[in-house]
């Protein structure tokens, strides 16, 4: 009778560990050019210094390798099922991170401060949660003005530029919010920048805060995002 060997977690380590930090893949993120996968935070930090894949050395992108990254949710779920307690550990660490940086929704940013809802609508009492159970972040949306820039006359500053929203909100959603608030056509193209760098539409506020803004130091709060009419460099 054939015997069946019970597989151990270590049998799969080569597929579920990050070659940069040597730990289990956290938010596994694949490089689309070569499909090598790393922890999201590891590969983002690597691309701050290099535009080559740390595994095979292929040039990922000449100017912005971050655009060539894709989160692998399927692999993430597989890893969580293979490694007992990993999901709970990561959720706890993430919660502690946001608590430490005072980004959880636990009060106003300043005396009697008023914040706009990212939905751009008043609460109608219908029970929509707008991700209110998520960790929250306060941001400042500032209009970036360049003298003589085309389209500047219709892109104004917001009356209430401080808002609080979920850390999972993407730049694409921020752009839609700005179009609503500024009464711009839904097809109007805007650039959203952090520290002078244009952010991709799929970047979340959490991602931007961790990889771009927190370099300013703990005292730099809230996070400032600037917007302007889109500039076509082509």
UniProtKB/Swiss-Prot annotation:
PROSITE patterns attached to this UniProt entry: ZF_RING_1, ZF_RING_2
Annotated function: Component of Polycomb group (PcG) multiprotein complexes; the complex class is required to maintain the transcriptionally repressive state of some genes.
Zn finger intervals (RING-type): 18-57
Record's keyword terms, sorted: Metal-binding, Nucleus, Repressor, Transcription, Transcription regulation, Zinc, Zinc-finger
GO biological process: nervous system development; regulation of transcription by RNA polymerase II
Region (Disordered): 97-130
GO molecular function: zinc ion binding
GO cellular component, one term: PRC1 complex
PANTHER family: POLYCOMB GROUP RING FINGER PROTEIN
Name the record gives this protein: Polycomb group RING finger protein 5-A
CDD domains listed in its UniProt record: RAWUL_PCGF5, RING-HC_PCGF5
Assembly mode: Component of a PRC1-like complex.
